[in-house]
Amino acid sequence: MKSLLVCLVLAVVVLVASGHHVELCKKNDAELKEALTCITSKLPAALGCNDKSCVFEKLCKEGDLDEALKKHFTEAEVQTLHTTATDCDHSHGHEHSHGHEHGHGHH
């Protein structure tokens, strides 16, 4: 289930990434929640879907989010997504630290 959530988050971020990512990262929690609610409400239409489960299916069914994104977004937008996600992840790294034990590598 976690991978589905990650996929949705990335899908939301990619729609924001084409120009508003800096502003999005500066929003407070209430503003961010409102923006994400608006974006997720537009996700189905953007992908030609009628509901969010269709969005999940379109973006996640191939198991390769990059490939799925490239079908719906330009290379530049996909690259912006990665940059934005990385920047935001670093600024909120403490929220994503669980389960990532450094030094105990799984080789």
Swiss-Prot record:
Gene3D superfamilies from the UniProt entry: 1.10.150.440
Q: What is its main location?
A: secreted
UniProt keyword annotations, A-Z: Antibiotic, Antimicrobial, Copper, Disulfide bond, Fungicide, Immunity, Innate immunity, Metal-binding, Secreted, Signal
> Which GO BP terms sit in this record?
defense response to fungus; defense response to Gram-positive bacterium; innate immune response; killing of cells of another organism
Any one annotated GO CC term: extracellular region
**Disulfide bond residue pairs:** 25-60, 38-88, 49-54
Basic and acidic residues bias spans: 87-107
Query: What is its subcellular localisation?
Result: Secreted
A GO molecular function held by the record: metal chelating activity
Q: Where is this region: Disordered?
A: 86-107
The positions making up the signal sequence are: 1-19
Q: What does this protein do?
A: Has bacteriostatic activity against Gram-positive bacteria, but not against Gram-negative bacteria. Has fungistatic activity against some but not all fungi. Binds and sequesters copper and iron ions. Copper-chelating is crucial for antimicrobial activity against M.luteus.
- The protein's name in its UniProt record: Antimicrobial peptide microplusin
**Organism for this UniProt entry:** Ixodes scapularis (Black-legged tick)
